[in-house]
C-alpha cells in the first residue's frame, strides 16, 4: 500500500467532476451539489476508512494504463553508437591452403630444368592442433623451438598409423569383414552398448552358392527330371555337400572361377611352419679388424688425428647406412667418437642432431667440447638457451620429452638423437623419461645409444628394435683400453705406507694371497696394540684424526710411485669436506702451477660481484686449489665445481675428493682412483657397492695414451672386508638395465588430449612390458591355429542323459582347483609343515605316482623349500602294451569316485616300493596316521639296493614292515585315509580356506547328483568336451595376453584417471578439460600447482611471497620453515599443505597406494625464508646464516624454482590470468641474479 501511495497517478478526466444530484421537493426540480465525500450520516465522524482491493488497484495501475511505467521511458531505450566503417574489409579473404604446386621437370643426366608441371597436394587442411602428421604445416616461428602445450606431438615411430593406402586396401577387402563379429556395439563415450545377440536360436548361416554349378551345361533331355528334383528332391538349402567334400570359398572375382583339373593324388597337408623369429637386436663382431673401412667410406664426414678402434669403425659404418646403434663400451673407451661422427654426418646432410645427457653439468661440458670441434652447436637447459638454430643441440632428456609432447618443429629436421649414459635409465626417479622419449620419437629419427657395459644390452636393444620396428646394431667392447689393477691399502702412518696389496691384476685374476696378506697386516698391528699402527677399534671407520693419518700415508706412497692425480670417492658430502680440510698441511703444486691456478681463479671469479667473491666456500676452495686439492659434490657452488673440473682436466688438481656424481659421464680420467669405503647409503639403508657402481667409478682410473695401467685402491681403515664381498663387487656382473617406467599425471594428460594416442599403447611399449609382449606375434599365430583347430573339432553330444555334461565338467575343474588351493595353503602354513614329520603317512600325487600312499622318512631343507624323503608304494615294473599295466596314471575321464576323496592306488600285482624326494607340491593330503619307522636305515638300505651289485638283495625287515603297513592302510581305506582337517586340526583361519572348504562340499554334492556319468557314452563325450574346453581356455589366455587387461600398470592407470576425473581435469568421456590442459604445461607437481592456481591461492600474494611458497615443491633438503616467517607466508604454507592433503585424500579414495602423509611429506619448506629474502634482494653471503643447507643445494633449489615460475607464467597465460602471469614473470626476474645464475664457464 505504501508503494501505491508513492506512485504518481495520472490526471483525472475533465468531465469526471465531483458532483452529486439532489431532488428538491416533489416538483421534479434537481440541484447539483459539489460536496465530495460519502453520503451524509448521523455518525459523528462518518464511515471508517477501508483498504482498497489490491487486485483491482494493480489491474488499474499496471494493466489498464501502463504508459506511466519507467520501462516505457524513451531515455531507457537502446542506444546506437556510430561505428567506423571500413569498406576495404569486404575485399579481405581468409587464406586457404593452396591445393597444388609447381614441380620442376629436370633432365635425368644433366639436371637442367626442362619445364614445370602442376601437382596436387595432399593433407592441405592439417594443423598442429588437429594432426600428428609430419605433413602438417609448421607452426609460428615463436613456437618452432619449444612447441606449444596445445599442439599435438608427431606420430611416434613403430605405432600403426592408418594411411590412405591402408584405407583403400580395407575398402577393397571389405568382403573379408565379418559383419556379425567385427562390428562395434558400444558408441564412443558410452559405457554400455546394444546387445544384438539373438534371444532364442541363431539364424542359420546362408551357404555360398556355387557359380560353377550354375554354369554347368544344361541337359535339355533331362529337364523334367531336374524339375522333379527341384520340387521334391534333396536339392535345396539343406542339400548335402558335393561328393568332393570341399567347402565352397568366396571368390574375389569371376576370373578366379576357372575350371581346374581334378588332382589325381591327394597330398596330405603339411604342418604349418612356425613364424620366423624376428631379430631386432643384431650383435656386431668387433674382434676382427675392418680392413675395407676407407674403401667403403672414401670421404668420411669427420676425421680424427688418431686411428679409430674397431668398434668405432663398425659403428661409423652403420651410421653411414642410417642404422640405429647401441654402443656399450667400457669407461674411457671412446664412445664420444660415435657421437662426433653422427654430428658431422648431420651437418653434411644439412639435418639436425640432438645430444641428450642425464645431468646439466654434462650438457655444459659437451657443449664446450662439441663447440670447439664443430662450431655450429647450441645448448638448451632449464635456464640457458644458446644458439637454438644450430645443427647440433645439446639438452637434457627432460627437455627433449617436453619438445616431443609439445610438437616442436625441430623434430622435423631431426636425423639423429644421441642418448648418452643410457644406463641412467635405472634411476628410479628419472628413468621413466628415457622410456617416454624413446617411445615418442618419430619414425624418421635414428637412435644412437651410448652406455657403459651392461649384461643385457641385447635385450634392451631388442626392445627398442621391436618398439621402432627397425634393427638395432649392438656394438660392445671386449676389454678396457687401459687395464686396471685393484689394491687393498691397510696403512695409516709413514711406517705403514707401503702396505699396498694387489687383489685383482690387469688380466682379471683374483689374488687370494694379496687378500690374506692384508688380513695378516691388520692382525699384526692389532696384536702389538701400538697407537702409531692404527686405531684401537679396528672394526670402526675412525674419526678425522685417523682419516688424516691414512690419507697422509697413502698420498706419500702415491707421490713416490708417481701415481697422481688421484680421485678419492667418498659417499658423504660432509666427509669430503672434512678429509680435504684435514690435508691443508700438504702442498702438492709447484710455484708455476700455483701461479697458473691463481690467474685462472681470478679470471673465473671476476664474473661474480664483490660480496660473492668473499663467500667462505669460495675462499676455502681457492686455498685448497692452490695446494692441489679439490672437492666436488652437490653442496659446492656450480661455478666452483666447474673451476675444479677444469683445473683437474689440466692436471693442476692432484687430489680430488668427490662423491659418486663425479663418475657420471664427466670425462675426467685420473691416474689413480681411491675408494674411502665400499659401503654407501642409498637413501634407505647402508649397503655394499653394486658391481656396476664400482666399475663406473673405478673406470675413471687410467688415462688413455698416458698410463699403461690404472690403479684402483680400496682403503681398509677398519677391518678388511670379506673376500666374498670383494670378489662380488670387483668381478660381479654390472646391474642390468631395468625399466623404471611409471605412470605420471603429465603423461596421462598429454596422451589423453590426443585422440589418436592411448595411454595403454604407451604402457604396452614400455620396457617393463617387454618380457610379456615380445611374443605377441607367436601368440597371434597360436591363437589363429587354435581357432582353426577348434573349428575342426566335433561338437560333443549334450542331449538326453548327457544334458548336464558341461556343468559336470565345470564342477570337476572347480573342485580340483579348490582342493589344490586348500592343499597349497596347508603346505605353506607353519602347522602344516610341522605335521610332516618322520613317520607321517601322506598321499602322493605327481607325474610318477597317482594317489599312492607313502610314509615320510626324512625331512631336509634347501635354499628355497623343504624336501621330504618318502617311502612310496608302487607297482612292479613290467613290460606290456596294456596302459593299465604300466603303473598308476591319472584317469582320463574323472568319475565321481575319482573326484570325491582319494581313490588310493592299489598294486595289481606284487607290491613294490620306492624312495622319492618329494616337494611340498607333491603331497596331495596329510593323513592322521603315523607309523613308527627308522627312516635313516630304510633310506640307506634302498640306496644300497639300487647298486647293480646289491640289486637282488632282499629288503630289510624295517622296509618290509613299513610297506605292509602302507598296503594294509590302502586296502582298509580305498577312498582315502582320514586326513587332517585344515581348520580344526591345523588351525588355519584363512578366509579363503574356510570358504574353499564349504565350496568343495557343495561341489561334491553336485557331482554325486550328476546324471551324465550313468550314460554309456559319457567317456567319449567327456573327452570331446574336455578337448574343446581346454582349447577355449588356452584361447582365452592368449587373448588376455594380447589385450590391454594384461598390462601390469592398468589398474593404477584407471585409478589415476579416476583422480583426474574427480578433480575435474577430465570429463566422463576422458576429454581433457581446461584444468587438465593447464596441468600439461607443468614440469612437476602438476596437480598441486594447478589446484593452487584454480583456488586463487597465489594471485593475492606478492611475487617474492609466491616464490618462497613454491620453494617447498622443489627443495630437496628437508627442514622446518622456522618461526621467523611473516604471517602471510605461514598462512600460505598451511594453505599449500591443505591443498596437498586434499589431493592426497582423493588419491587414497581412488585406490592409489600412496598415503596422504607420504604425499604431503614430499613438500619441504626448509628454504622458504632463504628464498624469500633472496627474492627481496638480500646478498648471497648473508643467506648462509638463515639456513644450514649447503650453498650448492640452495643454488639448485633457486634454479629449479625459476624454471617452475616460467611454467606457471605460461599456464597463467593459457588460463587468461594476466595478473598472475605478470607476477610469475616478476618472481623469475627477482630470482635470476648474481652467483645463483652466473653463466657457466663451459659456455664462455
Curated annotation (Swiss-Prot):
Coiled coil: none annotated. Residues 316-472 form the Helicase ATP-binding domain. Its EC number is 3.6.4.13. GO terms for molecular function: 3'-5' RNA helicase activity; ATP binding; hydrolase activity; RNA binding. The modification Phosphoserine is found at residues 242, 253. It is an enzyme of class 3 (hydrolase). Its main location: nucleus. It comes from the Eukaryota. GO terms for cellular component: nucleus; Ski complex. Residues 582-752 form the Helicase C-terminal domain. It is found in: Nucleus; Cytoplasm. SUPFAM superfamilies: P-loop containing nucleoside triphosphate hydrolases. Residues 218-249 are annotated as: Disordered. GO terms for biological process: nuclear-transcribed mRNA catabolic process, 3'-5' exonucleolytic nonsense-mediated decay; rescue of stalled ribosome. Gene3D superfamilies: 1.10.3380.30, P-loop containing nucleotide triphosphate hydrolases. A motif (DEVH box) lies at residues 420-423. The keyword Hydrolase applies. It catalyses: ATP + H2O = ADP + phosphate + H(+). SMART domains: DEXDc, DSHCT, HELICc. PANTHER family: ATP-DEPENDENT RNA AND DNA HELICASE, ATP-DEPENDENT RNA HELICASE SUPV3L1, MITOCHONDRIAL-RELATED. Component of the SKI complex which consists of SKIC2, SKIC3 and SKIC8. Interacts with HBS1L isoform 2. Helicase component of the SKI complex, a multiprotein complex that assists the RNA-degrading exosome during the mRNA decay and quality-control pathways. The SKI complex catalyzes mRNA extraction from 80S ribosomal complexes in the 3'-5' direction and channels mRNA to the cytosolic exosome for degradation. SKI-mediated extraction of mRNA from stalled ribosomes allow binding of the Pelota-HBS1L complex and subsequent ribosome disassembly by ABCE1 for ribosome recycling. In the nucleus, the SKI complex associates with transcriptionally active genes in a manner dependent on PAF1 complex (PAF1C). Belongs to the helicase family. SKI2 subfamily. This is Superkiller complex protein 2. It comes from Mus musculus.
Amino acid at each position: 500500500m505504501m508503494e501505491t501511495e508513492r506512485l504518481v497517478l495520472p490526471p483525472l478526466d475533465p468531465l469526471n467532476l465531483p458532483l452529486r444530484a439532489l431532488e428538491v421537493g416533489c416538483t421534479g426540480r434537481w440541484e447539483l451539489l459539489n460536496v465530495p465525500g460519502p453520503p451524509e450520516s448521523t455518525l459523528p465522524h462518518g464511515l471508517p476508512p477501508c483498504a482498497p482491493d489490491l487486485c483491482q488497484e494493480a489491474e488499474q495501475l499496471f494493466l489498464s494504463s501502463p504508459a506511466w511505467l519507467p520501462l516505457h521511458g524513451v531515455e531507457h531505450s537502446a542506444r546506437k553508437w556510430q561505428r567506423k566503417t571500413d569498406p576495404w574489409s569486404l575485399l579481405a579473404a581468409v587464406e586457404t591452403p593452396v591445393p597444388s604446386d609447381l614441380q620442376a621437370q629436370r633432365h635425368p643426366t644433366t639436371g637442367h630444368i626442362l619445364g614445370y608441371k602442376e601437382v596436387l597436394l595432399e593433407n592441405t587442411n592439417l594443423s598442429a592442433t588437429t594432426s600428428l602428421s609430419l605433413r602438417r604445416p609448421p607452426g609460428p616461428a615463436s613456437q618452432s623451438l619449444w612447441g606449444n602445450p596445445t599442439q599435438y606431438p608427431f606420430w611416434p615411430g613403430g605405432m600403426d598409423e592408418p594411411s590412405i593406402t591402408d584405407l583403400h586396401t580395407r575398402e577393397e577387402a571389405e568382403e573379408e569383414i565379418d559383419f556379425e563379429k567385427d562390428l562395434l556395439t558400444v558408441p564412443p563415450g558410452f559405457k554400455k552398448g546394444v546387445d544384438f545377440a539373438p534371444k532364442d536360436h541363431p539364424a542359420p548361416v546362408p551357404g555360398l552358392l556355387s557359380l560353377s554349378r550354375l554354369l554347368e551345361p544344361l541337359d535339355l533331355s533331362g529337364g523334367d527330371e531336374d524339375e522333379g528334383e527341384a520340387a521334391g528332391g534333396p536339392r535345396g538349402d539343406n542339400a548335402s555337400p558335393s561328393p568332393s567334400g570341399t567347402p565352397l570359398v568366396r571368390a574375389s572375382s569371376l576370373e578366379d572361377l576357372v575350371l581346374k583339373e581334378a588332382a589325381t593324388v591327394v597330398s596330405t597337408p603339411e604342418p604349418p611352419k612356425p613364424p620366423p623369429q624376428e631379430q631386432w637386436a643384431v650383435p656386431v663382431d668387433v674382434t676382427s679388424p675392418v680392413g675395407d673401412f676407407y674403401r667403403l667410406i672414401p670421404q668420411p664426414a669427420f676425421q680424427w688425428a688418431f686411428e679409430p678402434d674397431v668398434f668405432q669403425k663398425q659403428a661409423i659404418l652403420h651410421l653411414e647406412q642410417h642404422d640405429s646403434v647401441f654402443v656399450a663400451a667400457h669407461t674411457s673407451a671412446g664412445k664420444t667418437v660415435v657421437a662426433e661422427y653422427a654430428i658431422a654426418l648431420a651437418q653434411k646432410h644439412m639435418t639436425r642432431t640432438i645430444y641428450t645427457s642425464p645431468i646439466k653439468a654434462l650438457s655444459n661440458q659437451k657443449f664446450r667440447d662439441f663447440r670447439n670441434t664443430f662450431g655450429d652447436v647450441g645448448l638448451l637447459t632449464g635456464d640457458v638457451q644458446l644458439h637454438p638454430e644450430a645443427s647440433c643441440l645439446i639438452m637434457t632428456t627432460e627437455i627433449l620429452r617436453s619438445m616431443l609432447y609439445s610438437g616442436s618443429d625441430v623434430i622435423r629436421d631431426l636425423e639423429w638423437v644421441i642418448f648418452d649414459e643410457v644406463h641412467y635409465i635405472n634411476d628410479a626417479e628419472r628413468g621413466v623419461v628415457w622410456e617416454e622419449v624413446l617411445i615418442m620419437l618419430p619414425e624418421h629419427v635414428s637412435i644412437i645409444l651410448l652406455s657403459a657395459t651392461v649384461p643385457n644390452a641385447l635385450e634392451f636393444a631388442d626392445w627398442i628394435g621391436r618398439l621402432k620396428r627397425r634393427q638395432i646394431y649392438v656394438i660392445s667392447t671386449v676389454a678396457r683400453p687401459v687395464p686396471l689393477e685393484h689394491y687393498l691399502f691397510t696403512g695409516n702412518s709413514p711406517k705403514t705406507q707401503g702396505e699396498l696389496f694387489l687383489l685383482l691384476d690387469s688380466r682379471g685374476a683374483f689374488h687370494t694371497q694379496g687378500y690374506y696378506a692384508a688380513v695378516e697386516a691388520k692382525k699384526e698391528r692389532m696384536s702389538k696394540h701400538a697407537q702409531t699402527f692404527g686405531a684401537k677399534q679396528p672394526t670402526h671407520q675412525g674419526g678425522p684424526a685417523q682419516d688424516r693419518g691414512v690419507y697422509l700415508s697413502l698420498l706419500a706412497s702415491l707421490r713416490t710411485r708417481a701415481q697422481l692425480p688421484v680421485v678419492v670417492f667418498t659417499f658423504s658430502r660432509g666427509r669430503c669436506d672434512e678429509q680435504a680440510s684435514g690435508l691443508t698441511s700438504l702442498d702438492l703444486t709447484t710455484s708455476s702451477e700455483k701461479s697458473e691456478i691463481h690467474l685462472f681463479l681470478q679470471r673465473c671469479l671476476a664474473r661474480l660481484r664483490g660480496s660473492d667473491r668473499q663467500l667462505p666456500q669460495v675462499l676455502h676452495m681457492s686455498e685448497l686449489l692452490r695446494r692441489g686439492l679439490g672437492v666436488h659434490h652437490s653442496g659446492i657452488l656450480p661455478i666452483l665445481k666447474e673451476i675444479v673440473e677444469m683445473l683437474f682436466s689440466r692436471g693442476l688438481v692432484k687430489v680430488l675428493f668427490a662423491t659418486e656424481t663425479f663418475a657420471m659421464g664427466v670425462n675426467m680420467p685420473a691416474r689413480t682412483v681411491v675408494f674411502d669405503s665400499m659401503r654407501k647409503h642409498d637413501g634407505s639403508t647402508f649397503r655394499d657397492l653394486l658391481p656396476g657402481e664400482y666399475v663406473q667409478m673405478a673406470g675413471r682410473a687410467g688415462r688413455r695414451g698416458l698410463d699403461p695401467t690404472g690403479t684402483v685402491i680400496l682403503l681398509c681403515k677398519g677391518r678388511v672386508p670379506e673376500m666374498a664381498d670383494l670378489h662380488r663387487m670387483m668381478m660381479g656382473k654390472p646391474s642390468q638395465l631395468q625399466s623404471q617406467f611409471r605412470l605420471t599425471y603429465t603423461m596421462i594428460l598429454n596422451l589423453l588430449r590426443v585422440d589418436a594416442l592411448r595411454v595403454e599403447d604407451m604402457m604396452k611399449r614400455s620396457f617393463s612390458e617387454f618380457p610379456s609382449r615380445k611374443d605377441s606375434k607367436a601368440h597371434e599365430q597360436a591363437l589363429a591355429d587354435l581357432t582353426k583347430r577348434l573349428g575342426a573339432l566335433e561338437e560333443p553330444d549334450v542331449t538326453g542323459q548327457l544334458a548336464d555334461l558341461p556343468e559336470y565338467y565345470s564342477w570337476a575343474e572347480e573342485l580340483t582347483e579348490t582342493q589344490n588351493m586348500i592343499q597349497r595353503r596347508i603346505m605353506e602354513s607353519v602347522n602344516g609343515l610341522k605335521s610332516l614329520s618322520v613317520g607321517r603317512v601322506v598321499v602322493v600325487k605327481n607325474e610318477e605316482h597317482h594317489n599312492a600312499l607313502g610314509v615320510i622318512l626324512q625331512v631336509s631343507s634347501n635354499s628355497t623349500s623343504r624336501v621330504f624323503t618318502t617311502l612310496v608304494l608302487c607297482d612292479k615294473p613290467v613290460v606290456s602294451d596294456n596302459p593299465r599295466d604300466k603303473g598308476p596314471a591319472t584317469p582320463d575321464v574323472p568319475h565321481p569316485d575319482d573326484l570325491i576323496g582319494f581313490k588310493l592306488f592299489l598294486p595289481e600285482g606284487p607290491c613294490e616300493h620306492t624312495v622319492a624326494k618329494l616337494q611340498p607340491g607333491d603331497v596331495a593330503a596329510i593323513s592322521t596316521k603315523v607309523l613308527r619307522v627308522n627312516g635313516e636305515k630304510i633310506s640307506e638300505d634302498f640306496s644300497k639296493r639300487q647298486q647293480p651289485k646289491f640289486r637282488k638283495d632282499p629288503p630289510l625287515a624295517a622296509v618290509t614292515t613299513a610297506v605292509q603297513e602302507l598296503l594294509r592302510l590302502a586296502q582298509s581305506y580305498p577312498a582315502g585315509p582320514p586326513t587332517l582337517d585344515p581348520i580344526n586340526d591345523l588351525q588355519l583361519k584363512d578366509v579363503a580356506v574356510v570358504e574353499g572348504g564349504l565350496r568343495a562340499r557343495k561341489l561334491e554334492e553336485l557331482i554325486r547328483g550328476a546324471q551324465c556319468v550313468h550314460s554309456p557314452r559319457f567317456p567319449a563325450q567327456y573327452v570331446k568336451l574336455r578337448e574343446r574346453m581346454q582349447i577355449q581356455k588356452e584361447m582365452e589366455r592368449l587373448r588376455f595376453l594380447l589385450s590391454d587387461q594384461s598390462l601390469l600398470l592398468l589398474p593404477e592407470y584407471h585409478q589415476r584417471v579416476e583422480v583426474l576425473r574427480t578433480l575435474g581435469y577430465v570429463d566422463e568421456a576422458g576429454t581433457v578439460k581446461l584444468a587438465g590442459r593447464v596441468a600439461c604445461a607443468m614440469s612437476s607437481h602438476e596437480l598441486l600447482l594447478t589446484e593452487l592456481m584454480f583456488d586463487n591461492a597465489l594471485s593475492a600474494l606478492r611475487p617474492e611471497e609466491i616464490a618462497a611458497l613454491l620453494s617447498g615443491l622443489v627443495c630437496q633438503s628437508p627442514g622446518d620453515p622456522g618461526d621467523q616467517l611473516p604471517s602471510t607466508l605461514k598462512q600460505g604454507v598451511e594453505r599449500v599443505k591443505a591443498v596437498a592433503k586434499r589431493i592426497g585424500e582423493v588419491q587414497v579414495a581412488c585406490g592409489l597406494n600412496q598415503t596422504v602423509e607420504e604425499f604431503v611429506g614430499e613438500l619441504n619448506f626448509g628454504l622458504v625464508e632463504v628464498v624469500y629474502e633472496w627474492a627481496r634482494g638480500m646478498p648471497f653471503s648473508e643467506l648462509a646464516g638463515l639456513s644450514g643447507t649447503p650453498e650448492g643445494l640452495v643454488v639448485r633449489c633457486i634454479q629449479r624454482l625459476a624454471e617452475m615460475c616460467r611454467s606457471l607464467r605460461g599456464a597463467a597465460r593459457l588460463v587468461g590470468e594476466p595478473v598472475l602471469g605478470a607476477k610469475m614473470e616478476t618472481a623469475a626476474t627477482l630470482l635470476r641474479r648474481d652467483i645463483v645464475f652466473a653463466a657457466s664457464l663451459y659456455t664462455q
